[in-house]
């Protein structure tokens, strides 16, 4: 569909977009405590945040307000078994934006901030997004961006396996639709709307088949 024409009133739409306003407490922590504040400081600002939250974002804040500290507040043990949901990675582009072309620094920040909210694949997804966003400032092609995310996370984690799969299927000649179906078929247990790994796998497919966009 066509992109809507811009109107000034659209700026207020961000107030209802949790993948935008949820980064505010982290940026406030960096502003006040420095670029390399620790996860306890990030957690303190998340605990005091006031926006409407859902999912593991809300669970983590509730845990913090009960006196729990990172990384326990975001752990699967204390986050209703859902700590691998996508909440952190849809917000994690800020980690790369504040570290233009400094991929390792973006990864470091994402590791600390991510454990305030999630655990495991949720954090790995955020790290991959942070790395790709940081690399995008100087990358000359999409492959460089894709590889920055792919190689920023452990080879044995689920998110990395999905990155490996989609590039292998692309190189084997699969079309966009075939690749999309292959990913869903290989990982049926993760084929739901909140899975951090699966949703980031879809992002990876979009990068690979976007003709440089």
Predicted feature residues:
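Generic N-terminal targeting/processing segments that precede catalytic cores or assembly contacts
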Residues: 1-12
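Accessory "access/gating" subregions that flank catalytic or transport cores
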Residues: 64-83, 94-102, 111-116, 130-213
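Active-site cavity-forming subdomains of large catalytic enzyme subunits
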Residues: 10-18, 22-126, 138-139, 143-145
């Amino acid at each position: 569909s066509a992109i809507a024409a811009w109107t000034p009133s659209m700026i207020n739409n961000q107030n209802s977009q949790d993948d935008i306003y949820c980064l505010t407490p982290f940026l406030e922590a960096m502003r006040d405590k420095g670029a390399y504040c620790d996860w306890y400081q990030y957690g303190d600002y998340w605990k005091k945040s006031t926006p409407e939250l859902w999912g593991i974002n809300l669970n983590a804040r509730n845990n913090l307000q009960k006196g729990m500290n990172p990384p326990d507040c975001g752990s699967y043990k204390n986050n209703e078994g859902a700590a691998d949901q996508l909440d952190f990675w849809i917000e994690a582009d800020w980690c790369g934006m504040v570290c233009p072309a400094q991929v390792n620094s973006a990864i470091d920040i994402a590791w600390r901030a991510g454990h305030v909210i999630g655990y495991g694949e949720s954090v790995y997804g955020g790290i991959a997004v942070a790395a790709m966003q940081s690399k995008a400032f100087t990358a000359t092609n999409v492959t460089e961006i894709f590889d920055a995310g792919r190689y920023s996370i452990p080879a044995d984690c689920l998110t990395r396996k999905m990155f490996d799969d989609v590039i292998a299927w692309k190189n084997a000649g699969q079309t966009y639709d075939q690749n999309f179906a292959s990913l869903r078929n290989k990982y049926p247990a993760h084929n739901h709307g909140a899975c951090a790994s699966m949703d980031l796998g879809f992002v990876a497919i979009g990068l690979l088949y976007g003709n440089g966009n």
